[in-house]
């Protein structure tokens, strides 16, 4: 039917810009939760251990909640990688604080900044692949 194909064409034209925006926002989210970026954004001289830990965790969660609706526009596999990237960051940050109870805050900041986020990298690759298949 001609009407069905026209409807699909119009839907495609409406959805594609939203999908592209979702891809952009989720790549930006992954970039913003990279360890060195988080440390640079949150750390300042004189910050307490508790405030530093809380601020990093809160930043990751706030960024995630801000981008939650993007789930509508990406595949389930991409969304799962986004979730795993977020969890990887939260777990690593908590582990540094728990494993180094007597370390000074500068050492903790340096240690956190040196981490990599392989799940984040996988998520970005997945997003790029989805984008390229539009």
Regions found by a protein language model. Give the residues of each.
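Conserved non-transmembrane functional hotspots
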Residues: 1-134
